[in-house]
Amino acid sequence: MAYENILFEQADGVARITLNRPQVLNALSLPLTLELDAAITRCEANDDVKAIIVTGSGEKAFSAGADIHEMAELSQEELERRGKQRGEATWHMATCRKPVIGVLNGLAYGGGALLASTFDLRIGCERTRFRFLAATYGRINSTWTLSALIGMPMAKELLYTGRVVEAQEAKAIGLLNRLVPASELLSTAHDLAKTIAQNTPAMVQGIKELLNEGLGCTWAERMEMERHLLSGRLKPSHPREGFKEFLDRKGRPR
């Protein structure tokens, strides 16, 4: 299958997917999101793939989040339609049967931070930084993933403030499993993925399912709570409002 926005490689039981829009910090356009979703489906259907690595192209960013210029041009109806598609793709990543390792080669902001929080494991380097920015721009996300990773008090702090989390802090609070030099990111990830791939696939997948569903309240229930809140009294703002300063400062891409 040919891709325009991602790169796909497979060897030794491990698939590697690279977000490939470095010119816009690997912003998550809908075409990229759908290609990523299709690649995950491809991995799930292939018994030769035992583990998956997801990373970003370039040295600056894993992903700077949603493609704001793309979203700003849409009507509210189209935003909601595409938002549903994005939500389904995010859910698919979070519940992928096979273990997913995120290689965070740079900043993970907004939707990029949400995507990173759905991975089973995260490996970062000195360039890795997180920002969970939804509240800053009049939206809500990551409520159903982040607290399971770093605990409720810290999740509240990061979601309420949208502040930057540098690599060392991310490792200390559990947002990163491993922190290594940038030059060792991919080799560390591949070694870990190959170790996982040596184990019985059905058992690894069963462990993942049990861990994810054993959090007292299932991810599905927590995500539904988030969706219900956003479709009721807390309507997300349109990108033209939430990202007005960004759009005014950056203008249209050339």
Outline where the language-model segments fall.
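C-terminal alpha-helix plus adjacent terminal tail
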Residues: 1-12, 46, 59, 162-168, ...
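Conserved CoA-thioester-binding segment of acyl-CoA-metabolizing enzymes
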Residues: 1-55, 91
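Terminal peptide-recognition signature
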Residues: 17, 21, 36, 54, ...
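Hydrophobic alpha-helical membrane-association signature
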Residues: 32-35, 82-85, 185
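Hydrophobic helix-cap positions at the C-terminus of alpha-helices
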Residues: 39, 43, 93-96, 196, ...
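Glycine- (often His-adjacent) and acidic-residue-rich active-site loop
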Residues: 56-92, 108, 218
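Hydrophobic alpha-helical segments typical of transmembrane helices
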Residues: 85, 89, 142-145, 154, ...
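Crotonase-fold acyl-CoA enzyme core
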Residues: 91-201
